[in-house]
Each structure stands twice: as C-alpha cells, then as structure tokens.
Amino acid sequence: MALVPGDHGSTFGGNMLTTAASYAGTKFLIDNDIPGQVKDMEPYLLGALNDLKGRFSFVTEVRGKGLLAAMDFDSDISGQVLTAANEAGILLNGPRPHTIRFMPPLNITREEIDEGVDRLGSALATI
C-alpha cells in the first residue's frame, strides 16, 4: 500500500522552530550524558526508596526503571501520602489508591535525592 498526498501529515511536522527545538533538546541530552546520569542515579534512588520501605511496614513494594519509580502501600492511603508529601514540599503522583509515583528530573543529583527522600520519610511518619 502506498501513501498518496494528504494521507499522512502533521500540522507542525517539519516546522523550522520545532525542528530546531528538537535538535537543541537532543543535543543537550547527548552533550550532558543525561542517559548516563539516569543510569547512575537509578540504583541510588531505588535504594533510598527501599530504605524507606524498611522503615515503614505499610510500604509493600518499591519498583522502577530509570528514574521513574513507584511505591505501593498495604492499603488505599496514597491520597494521605500525597497530601503529607505536598506539605513537605514534594510533588508526587498517585496513579492508584495504594500507589505513589516519582518522576524526578533526569539531571537530579544525589543530594537532591537525599533531600527528597528525607522529606518523604517525614511525610510517611505522619501517616
């Protein structure tokens, strides 16, 4: 099957501005070895979150890939956790009533992970 003119296209595809923005974003990722940083930070983040799992019996699982991570609870408390985390200055997501999700910036540092996990630990202690 062949495409004929008008079968496939996009409003902004090939636009010079979006092409330049895409190039700049890709160049930044490559020049700053963002994939390498993510690979280095993944075990650090998951390890820190698993440390919290060891401290709080209601945390049942920590999982993730790269810097996208989730924490499961033994009951539907993600709303409470999100509220407490927000009050502690952490923005998280609650995709399920018993799950919270972490999506930190790809250039996060160990110090920032430590600060975020400390704040999350304080939030979990209020549950």
Locations of regions flagged by a protein language model:
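Conserved N-terminal phosphate-binding loop of PLP-dependent enzymes in the Aspartate aminotransferase
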Residues: 1-127
